[in-house]
């Protein structure tokens, strides 16, 4: 069984998405990573994408 990693990304002021961390594809872990990043950068958009850049979740 292959567990896909999920990239947690933040949208910078130029509109580009930057990867800040990588989490295992586990819903609670993805949510925790996203919320942690959102707390550090409350005015920025945060998303989780898979290896094909498909959006898994977004804050």
For each predicted feature, which ranges?
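A generic structural signal for short, solvent-exposed coil/turn residues
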Residues: 2, 14, 38-40
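Intrinsic disorder/low-complexity segments
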Residues: 8, 24-25, 49
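Short, mixed-charge low-complexity intrinsically disordered segments
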Residues: 38-59
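A short, exposed loop/beta-hairpin motif centered on an aromatic-Gly-Thr core
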Residues: 15-28
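Exposed beta-strand and adjacent loop surfaces of beta-rich binding modules
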Residues: 3-7, 43-45
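Short beta-strand segments and strand-loop junctions that repeat across beta-rich extracellular domains
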Residues: 5-18
């Amino acid at each position: 069984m292959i567990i896909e990693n999920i990239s947690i990304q933040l949208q910078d002021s130029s509109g580009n998405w930057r990867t800040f961390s990588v989490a295992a594809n586990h819903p609670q872990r993805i949510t925790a990573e996203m919320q942690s990043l959102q707390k550090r950068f409350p005015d920025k958009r945060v998303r989780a994408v898979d290896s094909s850049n498909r959006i898994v979740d977004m804050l």
